[in-house]
Amino acid sequence: MEMYETLGKVGEGSYGTVMKCKHKNTGQIVAIKIFYERPEQSVNKIAMREIKFLKQFHHENLVNLIEVFRQKKKIHLVFEFIDHTVLDELQHYCHGLESKRLRKYLFQILRAIDYLHSNNIIHRDIKPENILVSQSGITKLCDFGFARTLAAPGDIYTDYVATRWYRAPELVLKDTSYGKPVDIWALGCMIIEMATGNPYLPSSSDLDLLHKIVLKVGNLSPHLQNIFSKSPIFAGVVLPQVQHPKNARKKYPKLNGLLADIVHACLQIDPADRISSSDLLHHEYFTRDGFIEKFMPELKAKLLQEAKVNSLIKPKESSKENELRKDERKTVYTNTLLSSSVLGKEIEKEKKPKEIKVRVIKVKGGRGDISEPKKKEYEGGLCQQDANENVHPMSPDTKLVTIEPPNPINPSTNCNGLKENPHCGGSMTMPPINLTNSNLMAANLNSNLFHPSVRLTERAKKRRTSSQSIGQVMPNSRQEDPGPIQSQMGKGIFNERTGHSDQMSNENKRKLNFSRSDRKEFHFPELPVTIQPKDTKGMEVKQIKMLKRESKKTDSSKIPTLLNVDQNQEKQENTGNAQTERKKNLPDVE
């Protein structure tokens, strides 16, 4: 009921309540039948019977069931709302309906009853209150027999809602062998009421109803008389014997001739003698004057008009649901594309920044003597090692660039992979790095070191040996813990001397969306071998030593080593001793 706004009560009875509600999204007015929560199974049985029928059968002259739901253990049936009934018409027209209107209504009611009977369905509660009438004059049969109409405050409820007035004699006597004729009897009683404005067999009890049936319609049949005499309810009761005219027009003088014939055919005491619904549709009352041929196009036009009105309401309700479904389909579709072709396109876009980054790292690694074709070949080996890091299984011929783009959210993984892989050959002989802040990183690197690339060519092996020779120039850079301060100072030296390399690395940082501070945390293990600028491609090992000596002389490279610490301690001791000697030699000032 969260989607509906309650506007008021339509009816209330022993089985449930009928509420007039408004859909909050579409504004459509509906009637919701709410069944009471009862421990007995009769309520659920009645509700499930109605739900099963309404879901199975659809007709222009039957009320439409919109939806069914259960809330707080109560069954809710949502119907289209038509607030006008034949009973309302009779209250407005006290002397009965006009003949043309009456014939149109009866024809539509018979169409609904014939549809039910053709499907072996018995309504069992046909009465003016259960015949809905739309504004365009379309009648629809409904089943609100479980609820009774609400009277004004202070008014007394009548027995009309019990529908006793329209019960066939076999139902009154509780005969178990009743069928479709009970609806025909109720139709005959309703026709008289619609034509005259007064109920034909109003009664206060079953015995009163039987007495009036005998007086106005006819005596009981032998079968029904036998049931009556054996019934303990009617024990000791004697019904009168009345002689009735056989002519229908004399029997029902207030009715039109043809209409009296229909009523007479409907109100037969023996159920086997009653007319069928299909025969009633072909009665002269409906076939004369070409009524059916004229009224059917009019009826279809009205039904089409109402369908258009309903179509203006229902798409509003279904449009939001359809939009949600379309969004879900789009989401599923885009996810599918991302997992297949779109992912490949995005990865191809990321190829260039990754290649640039690899080249810059090679410059940092001191591979200045490697030509460009060799770099491309080495990138193939690097991609194979990166593929070993990835979870996705790759074939030996697949390059890393086609696996996944760099992750800007977690740059440490990509940085470590790209920074360490160029030195994987030399790091095979490197002693374990014991860094307090990067144990996890060192462990990840070692896991990759013991899986060398199969695609490493002889040229890559030569570069590996050259990298080992370069690494042997400064053995302290591999064996000593550089520490975070040394890594920062090494960064400063590198930034001062390699302006062009900084520009390229800054471009790569923007593309990969990580800051310089993030790189400081992860790249310090190989900083000692990255102090060589890109412009020193043809330099020899001696020139590298000269650069490193000059870097030690600069103010920015005040990196304490073990030797420097010992020398500083000796200097401090010497200066301290000299000061004490001077103080001793100074004369005392009085």
UniProtKB/Swiss-Prot annotation:
Protein's UniProt name: Cyclin-dependent kinase-like 3
Pfam families registered for this protein in UniProt: Pkinase
GO MF annotation list: ATP binding; cyclin-dependent protein serine/threonine kinase activity; protein serine kinase activity
Active site: 125 (proton acceptor)
Domain notes per entry: The [NKR]KIAxRE motif seems to be a cyclin-binding region.
Reactions catalysed: L-seryl-[protein] + ATP = O-phospho-L-seryl-[protein] + ADP + H(+); L-threonyl-[protein] + ATP = O-phospho-L-threonyl-[protein] + ADP + H(+)
InterPro entries given in the database record: CDK (IPR050108), Kinase-like_dom_sf (IPR011009), Prot_kinase_dom (IPR000719), Protein_kinase_ATP_BS (IPR017441), Ser/Thr_kinase_AS (IPR008271)
Motif [NKR]KIAxRE boundaries: 45-51
Region Disordered, annotated ranges: 459-508, 547-590
Subcellular localization(s) per the UniProt record: Cytoplasm
SMART domains on file: S_TKc
Compositional bias (Basic and acidic residues): 547-556, 580-590
Positions carrying Phosphothreonine: 158
Residues the record lists as Phosphotyrosine modifications: 160
Stretches assigned to the Protein kinase domain: 4-286
Entry GO terms, CC: cytoplasm; nucleus
Taxonomic lineage of the native organism: Eukaryota, Metazoa, Chordata, Craniata, Vertebrata
Alphabetized UniProt keyword annotations: ATP-binding, Cytoplasm, Kinase, Nucleotide-binding, Phosphoprotein, Serine/threonine-protein kinase, Transferase
EC number from the UniProt entry: 2.7.11.22
EC class: transferase
Family: Belongs to the protein kinase superfamily. CMGC Ser/Thr protein kinase family. CDC2/CDKX subfamily.
Biased composition (Polar residues): 466-477
Native source species: Macaca fascicularis (Crab-eating macaque)
Residues reported in the UniProt entry to bind ATP: 10-18, 33
